[in-house]
Amino acid sequence: MSIISRIFNTYKESLKKSLERYENAYASNAQNALQFYEKFLNRLFIDYGSIYSNSHMVNQIISKIEEYFQKREIPFVAIDGTCSRDPFSDFMVFFAAAYGVKGSIYIETQPPKLRYEKWSMDQDVSIVAYVPIPYAEAGDVIDSNYREEFVVDDRNKINLSNIHTRLMQLAEIYLAYQMAKGSTIANPKLILMDLSLSSVLMSTDVGMERIHLFGHPIGTRTLNKRDGLVVYAHPFNSKLGIPTCKKYRRWAYVVRLITENEGKPVDIDTLVSSACISENEWVKSLHEPYAKELVSIQNREIHPNFDFSASWFDAVRLFEDLCDRLFHKRDPEALIYPVRDNGTIRYRWMSPEDIAFLVAIGLRALIETCWERNIMLLSIAKDSTTKYFSKNYIGVMRETGVFPQIPVGYLPWTDRALLESIACQVDELSCPWAITEFDSVFMTLHVEEENGQKIIRGVRGNVVNQERLFARSLAQFFNRKIKATPLMGHVIFIDRLLDPTLDAPFLNGPEILSSELGTIHPAYFGTNESMNYGQAISIWLLDVLTRNLFPEVIGYPDPLHKADWGAKSVKRRVDKLIKSSEIAFRSRPLSRLFRTIRDSRRR
């Protein structure tokens, strides 16, 4: 046997053994998952397939849909995005686009009818940006959390920035905001997005010290740090009680109270009575650095240092103006702004943190617009390796005593693998099925063990997602068990924006007490014995939109697949334009690399 044959044969044996270990571990974990399901987890599974087979239950859900949307025709828009980065010898081009598919669901007939609509000729079918950034200015766009000494050249610096993914998020959020903000006659009542909104919300909390946009002109004034604090205090909803008075961000609660009081001062007694926090604790919180930038205490009254409503209005205007220049006017200089550096004015490119801040503004504006216009906002994530349900949510609820302390063996590695393994083994489950919703705040909470004691802590220190804002769940929309090996679609991840008209009964759930984070008041949707109409409506609508016409995306809503088609089609067209852009640099010898010049001379 030759050396090459021995190498290949050794690799084959190693691969075979690794595969055997993987399959044995997966089979063992799947058996543990089934036992956990039989002992407890079955209480968190909702068999919507059986519910929807009951005509009486379907009529109740349709009645709730009519009551919520105030119509029997539900216009929707599905939004997906795409992005890329194309490196050339002197510059890199970032491309980002978002594409929307419009349609309507008619619930007058059973089964409901689905109709797609074409965009009118005077509307853009997409939102596109292509931004060429020279390597000479790479220092502005690099992410500030990496070690520069480990990067070889400017091209790798920009590669690490991942600014194109931030631009794609900005495009998707802006398109959704535009759709929600449109005329009340034509605006959708259901917005579907192909991303996890709760994850985006968490990722945009980058820290005030890393945002360089402060100083950017807004009309006759400039954006200040305190404007950023007002942005992160939003969204406001008094019926949902958000923002809450969590220990590390109580100033946001005060900003909401003063805004709801039309900018008038609020006395400390009102704070104490409304939040059940002692006066000493409030005084201590109001003397923190961020709080002192926003408010001041005078004669037991809390006075705003500036107009919070005007500040929020200006921040939204900045988001709208920059996005209009970037995505509609295709102005690459929309991402360039003046900064003062050592007493002189220079122009710099926006960093990923700056764009994340714009995404934070847009997402909060989108949320408040959806509440104002009674729009259901759903986001779908296809691929995720997270364990927010099995580790974070169940772990924290077990520690607080809400869920029983049932011994559990090793489970499959991710939430999706856990639930898909259960769906394969439990014949009684019929699609669609879903787990009970849980508050997105559990994404940032987990249980740690310290000195033999279990402590509930934040995953990112004291940065915790806003509770009572998004409800997360996992669901499956296609599972056919005709053969021994079932034909099934992947479990997908669903985020639903909470709405006071649907979710008020679930706001008085168990409190989570933490010495580091204070008291957290999440929404709690109970077990499958509780009827959650918000989730029932969203799953029913998604089931109507999941036609299973395309085998490559079976069990996935068709409008989002069509939006993905549209986004990829736009990308293919723009790719040709971008690749042709280097022609302008070929006539400039100084811009060409030594290797390029040498290789071009054939001798």
What would you call each of these model-derived segments?
Residues 1-62, 67-69, 153-603:
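Long, contiguous domain-sized segments
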Residues 70-74:
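A short, charged/proline- and glycine-enriched loop
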Residues 76-79:
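Short hydrophobic beta-strand that contains or immediately precedes a catalytic carboxylate
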Residues 81-87:
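Short acidic, Gly/Ser-rich segments with clustered Asp/Glu that frequently serve as metal-coordination loops
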Residues 92-104, 209-213, 395-397:
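Amphipathic alpha-helical scaffolding segments
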